[in-house]
Curated annotation (Swiss-Prot):
Pfam families: SH2
Domain of life: Eukaryota
The entry's keywords: Cytoplasm, Mitochondrion, Phosphoprotein, SH2 domain
GO biological process: negative regulation of B cell apoptotic process; negative regulation of mitochondrial depolarization; signal transduction; T cell activation
Assembly: Interacts with FES and TNK2.
Tissues in which the UniProt entry reports expression: Predominantly expressed in spleen and thymus. Appears not to be expressed in heart, brain, liver, kidney, embryo, lung and ovary.
Protein name listed in UniProt: Hematopoietic SH2 domain-containing protein
Length: 334
């Protein structure tokens, strides 16, 4: 607060450019005699009125970022706007000739006349009261800003040197805290990079995923082919197989009846066994061959289906490539 109170009243915003960019340049080799700070146009004319022709001064402009050159002409005082460019050069408004500094501009027009009037600059107009210069407020504020910045730097260095090592270690945040802050303040760019890395991993895993899906589809197609072969065999021997199945059902029904009878009459099982053997022997050889072929194909189908992994269609859908899934929320136009 003490340093803030020592600062002079702040300058108008239109003069900030001079304090921050021009004050040090003008003061490097001494403030020139022709510089007069922020005096008004009327004050400049009053100072030049009693001076000889060609007497000039340069003042800080109130209307633009730059200066104003005022000099004594034959019948009046003339005023020229001096524009400053971003690279530090200066020139009269509307003139194509640029100069490296105000000193260079003044030196040039002391030798070359100012167009279109053809008048030369002759001598500089000094201060009316050298003990009370009119640019004091500009450089006072600039010096105060420099001193305030230096005192803040010095104060920071003193605090760092006087801080004990224990307190410094306590004040030093841990790596986990830094990680938490970093994760909490994650920017959209970081999120986009993470999403891009995930997408790249999914793209790299596409060959393995497609290979797994291909293997499952191949196994299921093999099982379907076995079923189709079994149906073809059944169609080739349709009539005998049907009759054999009907005979088997008849024999099964007879066997069940025989079992019921045997429970009621235990003396008949031997007769039933003999009748069943006679019935099997009376079957045609072609029927027995067809029936055994169907049973063989049925065993192959059962073994093929039992050897394959169970199908889990939701899981297979989960292995689909990324371009077939709904777009993520950060996708353009989503």
């Amino acid at each position: 607060m003490a340093e803030a109170r020592r600062l002079p009243p702040p300058l108008p915003p239109r003069l900030d450019w001079f304090v921050h960019t021009q004050a040090d340049l003008l003061a490097q080799s001494g403030i020139p005699e022709w510089f007069h700070g922020t005096i008004s146009r009327e004050a400049a004319e009053n100072m030049l009125e009693s001076q000889p022709l060609g007497t000039f001064l340069i003042r800080v402009s109130h209307s633009h970022v730059g200066y104003t050159l005022s000099y004594k002409a034959q019948t009046c005082c003339r005023h020229f706007m001096v524009k400053l460019s971003e690279d530090g050069t200066c020139a009269f408004a509307g003139d194509h000739m640029t100069h490296a500094s105000l000193h260079a501009l003044v030196t040039f027009h002391q030798q070359k006349p100012i167009r279109p009037f053809g008048e030369l600059l002759t001598q500089a107009c000094g201060q009316e009261d050298p003990a009370n210069v009119d640019y004091e407020d500009l450089f006072l504020y600039s010096n105060a800003l420099v001193q305030d910045a230096e005192s803040q730097i010095l104060r920071t260095e003193v605090q760092r040197s006087s801080c004990p090592p224990e307190e410094a270690s306590e004040r030093k945040p841990s790596t986990t805290t830094k990680g938490e802050f970093a994760s909490a303040s994650c920017s959209p760019k970081a999120l986009f990079e993470d999403s891009g890395q995930k997408l790249w991993k999914n793209l790299r895993s596409l060959p393995q995923t497609s290979q797994r899906v291909k293997q499952r589809l191949t196994s299921h197609l093999l099982a379907m082919n076995l079923l189709g072969d079994a149906r073809q065999v059944a169609q080739q021997h349709h009539s005998p197989v049907t009759r054999a199945f009907s005979w088997d059902s008849t024999s099964h029904s007879e066997d069940s009846c025989a079992a019921t009878t045997s429970l009621q009459n235990p003396a008949e099982p031997q007769a039933l066994r003999g009748r069943e053997a006679t019935f099997r022997d009376s079957r045609p050889a072609s029927w027995r061959k067809a029936f055994s072929g169907v049973k063989a194909w049925r065993g192959k189908v059962v073994r093929a289906l039992s050897a394959q992994e169970p199908v889990d269609f939701p899981e297979a859908q989960g292995w689909l490539p990324e371009e077939y899934l709904p777009p993520p929320p950060f996708a353009p136009g989503y």
